[in-house]
Structure formats: structure tokens, C-alpha cells
A protein has these predicted regions:
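Structural/interface elements that position substrates and couple domains in central-metabolism enzymes
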Residues: 1-254
Length: 257
């Protein structure tokens, strides 16, 4: 089954570039956001966020009629959810936006559709999302209950750096975590529409943990570099020279201090 129409739920720093890249490949893309100002801005061929090269891709896609935005989900062949997952006051992950997005698309789901969660989420979130969808649509079979589902579900985290998103979306490898191997294969087919990197397939829980591991590795490196700067300041050592020298070690240079 081909992907004639793709819906992206959440038109922020990940959702809008993703929608624009799919549209640049000639796919009909419907972006959905509760922010009416963002929707109106995009439909004028402009952008409401700052990201190099995004403006021209969005403008061209809107002018061709391949990209449009709305505040309400519509029927599509694939749905990508890219909404915020902030922390609550007690530092617990807040999945209310994911739940709201899932419930918003549930009425328009049909047999053969693909639903992908891209938001950074705790392990088990994709399964939870699938449960919300199944509860809302008992007439459809989902992968947690049936080996031959009507709706395919996967977790495919973004792996891009702000300021380089339009390049890295296309060139970086993509972790594809389906709830079943068939879900992974279906999600890989979707991303291959624009992806030049490799689709690396795994299960949803491993993909969720992979994204958290990548973020944690970055955070640990930042904290380590900060500690080095404090020590170097106390010892009258140039921290940048130190880092450049340390990165010449073959085992350290691979990770980059």
C-alpha cells in the first residue's frame, strides 16, 4: 500500500521540517496543530519557527499544493505524531499531548494506516499510545492484540540538531521501532520516501530506550566538559587546548570530548 497522503501532528521544530521534507518529494502532506497562528502562517507559505532553509521548502510545497495545515486531523495513510513531551512538576514524563494527539486521529483511522510516534518518550509509550487508539477504535485491530493488525504502529525518534535539521533529517540513519516486524517494515517504507541514511529496524521499546540513551550521552558529555572547564580555570589551563589534545587519542576522539 502506498502513502498518498501523510499527516503530521504537531508543527513545531520537528513536525514542520518533517512535513516539509515529505512534501518536497511530491507527497500530499497535511500538517495539524492546535496553534491557529502557526496553521495560518504555514498556509501562507511562511514559517513560525527559525530553521535554516525551512522557509523556502515550506513556501515551495505550499505553492505546489503539496503541503497545507489545519487544526483538525483528516484521513491519511500515515500519521506522524511529533508533539511535546515535557516533565510534570514531580519530574515525571507528561504524555498528555501524545494522548490528545492519538485520540484526535482515532476517528479518522482506517485499515492499512500507519501511526508513528516521534516524540522523545519513556519506554512503553508507544504501547500506551496503541492502547489509547485501540480503546477509541474497537472496530480496528492493533498490533498489541493481533499479529495481523489493521493499523501499524511504530516509534521512530528524530535524531537531528537544531540549525541542521533540513540536512540531518535526510542524511542521518533512522531507528525504526515497530511494535511488530511488519510495523517496522511499514515505517521503513515511509521514511525511505526521503531518507538517504539507513533505516535500522528494531522493536518499539528498544527504539525508545535508544533515543533516551542518545540524549543522556550528550548530557553526560556536556556535564563532563563543564567540569573540565572548572578544573582548568582553577589550574590556569586552557580548556580548549586540553580538549583538542585529548581528542587526538584514538579512543577518545571517536566520542569527542
Amino acid at each position: 500500500m502506498s502513502f498518498e497522503t501523510i499527516s503530521v501532528i504537531g508543527l513545531g521544530y520537528i513536525g514542520l521540517p518533517t512535513a516539509a521534507v515529505f512534501a518536497s518529494k511530491g507527497k500530499k502532506v497535511v500538517g495539524v496543530d492546535i496553534n491557529a497562528h502557526a496553521v495560518d502562517t504555514i498556509n501562507r507559505g511562511a514559517i513560525h519557527i527559525v530553521e535554516p532553509d525551512l522557509d523556502r521548502v515550506v513556501q515551495a510545497a505550499v505553492e505546489r499544493g503539496d503541503l497545507r495545515a489545519t487544526t483538525q486531523p483528516e484521513a491519511a495513510d500515515a500519521f506522524l505524531i511529533a508533539v511535546p513531551t515535557p516533565f510534570m512538576a514531580e519530574r515525571q514524563p507528561d504524555l498528555r499531548f501524545v494522548r490528545a494527539a492519538a485520540l484526535s486521529i482515532a476517528p479518522v483511522l482506517k485499515k492499512g494506516d500507519l501511526v508513528i510516534l516521534e516524540s522523545t518518550s519513556p519506554v512503553g509509550s508507544t504501547e500506551q499510545m496503541a492502547d489509547w487508539l485501540a480503546a477509541a477504535r474497537p472496530d480496528l485491530r492493533f498490533p498489541q492484540h493481533d499479529g495481523d493488525p489493521d493499523v501499524f504502529v511504530a516509534y521512530c525518534p528524530e535524531r537531528v540538531l537544531p540549525g541542521q535539521i533540513m540536512t540531518e533529517l535526510i542524511s542521518n540513519d533512522r531507528v525504526i521501532g515497530g511494535m511488530t516486524p511488519a510495523c517496522s517494515a511499514r515505517a521503513s517504507d515511509l521514511y525511505r520516501i526521503f531518507l538517504q541514511g539507513e533505516c535500522v529496524e528494531t522493536n518499539a521499546r528498544t527504539a525508545e530506550m535508544c533515543k533516551l540513551t542518545e540524549n543522556s550521552f550528550r548530557d553526560v558529555n556536556i556535564a563532563f566538559a563543564n567540569e573540565l572547564s572548572l578544573i582548568c580555570a582553577a589550574q590556569q589551563i586552557n580548556v580548549w587546548e586540553l580538549i583538542a589534545l585529548a581528542n587526538r587519542h584514538p579512543q577518545i576522539g571517536r566520542a569527542h570530548v
